Amino acid sequence: MAHKKAGGSTRNGRDSNAKRLGVKRFGGETVLAGSIIVRQRGTKFHAGNNVGCGRDHTLFATANGKVQFEVKGPNNRKYISIVAE
């Protein structure tokens, strides 16, 4: 009588889906109002001129223009602004 005992269970076998975070529009690119510039967790980038910040810290353009990245302030924070053309 050939028998195989139960193999037991494992605590592995899960993985979350990728969240597609990151910069969507880079410096110098022309954007329209409402365009998403960065999807992020927390404020790695801060909203500058003509940029809004969503509930999930997504940065988006509030005016048409070119994307500009800048580092300023005593803590060297990264700001994203839209410069009108």
UniProtKB/Swiss-Prot annotation:
Residue ranges, annotated region (Disordered): 1-21
Keyword NADP among record annotations: no
Which InterPro entries does the entry link to?
Ribosomal_bL27, Ribosomal_bL27_CS
Mention one GO molecular function: structural constituent of ribosome
Q: Name one GO cellular component term.
A: cytosolic large ribosomal subunit
Q: Which UniProt keywords apply?
A: Ribonucleoprotein, Ribosomal protein
| PROSITE patterns, sorted | RIBOSOMAL_L27
GO BP: translation
Similarity field? Belongs to the bacterial ribosomal protein bL27 family.
Q: Which NCBIfam families match?
A: L27
Tell me the protein's name.
Answer: Large ribosomal subunit protein bL27
Q: Which organism is it from?
A: Erwinia tasmaniensis (strain DSM 17950 / CFBP 7177 / CIP 109463 / NCPPB 4357 / Et1/99)
Which gene is annotated as encoding this protein in its UniProt record? rpmA
